[in-house]
């Protein structure tokens, strides 16, 4: 017997609900001095000194991040004459909602509306995902572009891509790089071939990473690096390309952690839904449930990126943000297959994920409305 559709099953309703419940948090919290205020200061310094491609903080080079997010801060500073934290926070919240929409649209052929609701709300309320959706950082922007690139790859892989998708794929990859740096290319370049190897279709790499992808990526990066060199000279370009990439990967000068760091941080970074998503992700290994090609791809991306980032010297929990979506949605597809097979446990878990997520969002509303000081201490 089919269940009647509910209001919560509508993506537009869920998106509006997320926005309304997080609105007090967005309006009443204070900006953090270590990261958020620093980005505003970098934007002010760039506007004052006429820098556009090269970033500086208190006169010192700040090649840690590409300029895209700072450009957004600069744009609103120029338009409004002051910084508006609420508008800037939307450039984290809106990409988070777009990421949910992409994953729901992508997985709609394997997930019912009820399971899509559970998957997207549980992803939204993962600790680090929710936190990244309300702070002034570029991580969610990068996650959105990575998710778009993965969806575009899947359309190419399954023969559903339009001619434009062959150009959109490298464009999304570039925008991910331009948002956060080299971590933006790691999933499309390193994790996709892992999946293709397991599927014995490695030759498809020539279609995904063919001449169009490399041409557009080289052209856009070349333009960026040329203007960086023109404005900041060889020293800034060297800092951007080598010190901030190879230095962080091999012998990090910031956030250096042991190789097993993510083995324990992933549990609280995805909390509370790591307790469901991660164990369920291992079920196909034990033949408890069959994994479709889509699930295999999502899990291959999550597993390979986890291993790759564990081998990188510099580690922060938020670096795992791009794999939260694949993990949550893959686990929900597996749970729905179990429910279709008569599993009562899967039904219970779906309800826990749905109502637990709504409870977390309601708690965020109350805290933002009545206890903003406590929220500031958390961030």
Predicted regions and their residues:
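Transmembrane helical bundles and short interhelical boundary loops of multi-pass, membrane-embedded
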Residues: 347-379
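Membrane-integral, polyisoprenol-dependent glycosyltransferases
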Residues: 1-344, 371
